[in-house]
From Swiss-Prot:
Active site: 168 (proton acceptor), 287 (proton acceptor)
Catalytic activity entry: 2 (2R)-3-phosphoglycerate + 2 H(+) = D-ribulose 1,5-bisphosphate + CO2 + H2O; D-ribulose 1,5-bisphosphate + O2 = 2-phosphoglycolate + (2R)-3-phosphoglycerate + 2 H(+)
Name of the protein: Ribulose bisphosphate carboxylase large chain
Coiled coil: none
Protein family (similarity comment): Belongs to the RuBisCO large chain family. Type I subfamily.
UniProt superkingdom: Bacteria
Pfam families tied to this protein: RuBisCO_large, RuBisCO_large_N
Site, as annotated: Transition state stabilizer: 327
Cofactor(s) needed: Mg(2+)
Gene Ontology MF, one: ribulose-bisphosphate carboxylase activity
General remark: The basic functional RuBisCO is composed of a large chain homodimer in a 'head-to-tail' conformation. In form I RuBisCO this homodimer is arranged in a barrel-like tetramer with the small subunits forming a tetrameric 'cap' on each end of the 'barrel'.
Binding positions for substrate per the UniProt entry: 116, 166, 170, 288, 320, 372
């Protein structure tokens, strides 16, 4: 029988979960939340409430607290900061002991950090801005099935970014016509083509038919060009059993890479598929469909940098990241920050890029950043400058929309990429001299010349909704 006294009733969260003098441990999970409390709720109380509800707390004192070491297991709100430009919101920094989380389980981490607390009445809005995953926990996770260097070795592609294309129209093509589009793109010079996120197994194109026609197209393009090619076969399915059936069939027919929608498919399915890919030598492309539901509102949800970290833990060799210059939302500094979080081994805190904590990935492989969404040849200099070589540049409409057809669109993109890489390696400034570099290359490539004429007026100049806090620039 414990000698501790037990006092029933309700007490302020800050009495237990607010510890401004707490010394953060290397083994702690750290989280930064942007909090907008309800009127009349003090900042310390709101921060402590978030710490409690995302760890050991509930709305009242319970006698079973005496049966464990609550002081060891609880989350602690240890720091509060103002949010520049927002008088209502503040940043709450919370530390969680590593033993609160099951090893190698992104599912359990997110169930704890964001599973219940986002509906808490004490806060008007809540956003998870960043997390620090301790190295001790990173080492329990398998991470990407292969990573950047292994993929380059498998595909025999070095010294430049990879080129891809999403087949369009994304829905409605027959399997035979879909395969034809794949073949034209790959023979024209692309490294990969891909299924779009919502291509699964619809009445107009069942998955098995698509896989067979696409693999035939891929192998034919390989034989003609002498280059290794691939198509991201989307194995996302109604159930895990069907997902693995599709993955096994892709392996049987010789496909080098498959694809998964990791947010709609779920972290459990994604982690299992990543482990299967590692065991079976398959590359894994990850689409982020549904991400903007969670990450676009600057006051509520989960920032994409957190989702990117979660994917690296769960496993994937590619991840869509936005483009900065294309049709999708993306602040440049923030995008460069999460590109590094996907690829580098150690990323220091850098508020100018929205990174709130140091992140050490140890020996975990990196992930190719995928730039996709409304891009064309005129964007190539900026893309190479922003993303570097360890990226996949995917031109859907920017390939299939070429007036001369898919193969010509692919050739235009290949010439533009190689011209930009060559110019960069010679020391030229791509963002300042990009127009001249492309115009010079177009003198020897009629496909590129026509592409430049076709899309010379196409821009996506809209104000970014989710901006970095301006005083951290």
């Amino acid at each position: 029988m414990s000698s501790k006294s037990y006092s029933a009733g309700v007490k302020d969260y800050r009495d237990t979960y607010w510890e401004p003098d707490y010394q953060v441990k290397d083994s702690d999970f750290l989280a930064c939340f942007k909090v907008v409390p309800q009127a009349g709720v003090p900042r310390e109380e709101a921060a402590a409430a978030v710490a409690a509800e995302s760890s050991t707390g509930t709305w009242t004192t319970v006698w079973t607290d005496l049966l464990t070491d609550l002081d060891y297991y609880k989350g602690r709100a240890y720091k509060i900061e103002d949010v520049p430009g927002d008088d209502e919101a503040f940043y709450a920094f919370i530390a969680y002991p590593i033993d609160l989380f099951e090893e190698s389980s992104v599912v359990n981490v997110f169930t704890s950090l964001v599973g219940n607390v986002f509906g808490f009445k004490a806060v008007r809005s809540l956003r998870l801005e960043d997390v620090r995953i301790p190295l001790a926990y990173v080492m329990t996770c398998n991470g990407p099935p292969h990573g950047i260097q292994v993929e380059r070795d498998k595909m025999d592609k070095y010294g430049r970014g990879l080129l891809g294309c999403t087949i369009k129209p994304k829905l409605g093509l027959s399997a035979k016509n879909y395969g034809r589009a794949v073949y034209e793109c790959l023979r024209g010079g692309l490294d990969f083509t891909k299924d779009d996120e919502n291509v699964n197994s619809q009445p107009f194109m069942r998955w098995r038919d698509r896989f067979l026609f696409v693999q035939e197209a891929t192998e034919k393009a390989q034989q003609e060009t002498g280059e290794r090619k691939g198509h991201y076969l989307n194995v996302t399915a109604p159930s895990p059993e069907e997902m693995y059936e599709r993955a096994e069939f892709a392996k049987e027919i010789g496909a080098p890479i498959i694809m998964h929608d990791f947010l709609t498919g779920g972290f459990c399915a994604n982690t299992g598929l990543a482990r299967w890919c590692r065991k079976n030598g398959m590359l894994l492309h990850i689409h982020r469909a549904m991400h903007a539901v969670m990450d676009r509102n600057p006051r509520h949800g989960i920032h994409f940098r957190v989702l990117a970290k979660a994917l690296r833990l769960s496993g994937g060799d590619h991840l869509h990241t936005g483009t900065v210059v294309g049709k999708l939302e993306g602040d440049r500094a923030a995008t460069e920050g999460w590109i590094d979080l996907l690829r580098e081994r150690f990323i220091p805190e850098d508020r100018a890029r929205g990174i709130f904590f140091d992140q050490d990935w140890g020996a975990m492989p990196g992930v190719f950043a995928v730039a996709s969404g409304g891009i064309h040849v005129w964007h190539m200099p900026a893309l190479v400058s922003i993303f570097g070589d360890d990226a996949v540049f995917q031109f859907g409409g920017g390939t299939l929309g070429h007036p001369w057809g898919n193969a010509a669109g692919a050739a235009a993109n290949r010439v533009a990429l190689e011209a930009c890489v060559k110019a960069r390696n010679e020391g030229r400034n791509l963002e300042r001299e990009g127009k001249e570099i492309l115009q010079a290359a177009a003198q020897h490539s009629p496909e590129l010349k026509i592409a430049m004429e076709t899309w010379k007026e196409i821009k996506f100049e809209f104000e970014t909704v989710d901006k970095l806090d301006t005083t951290h620039r």
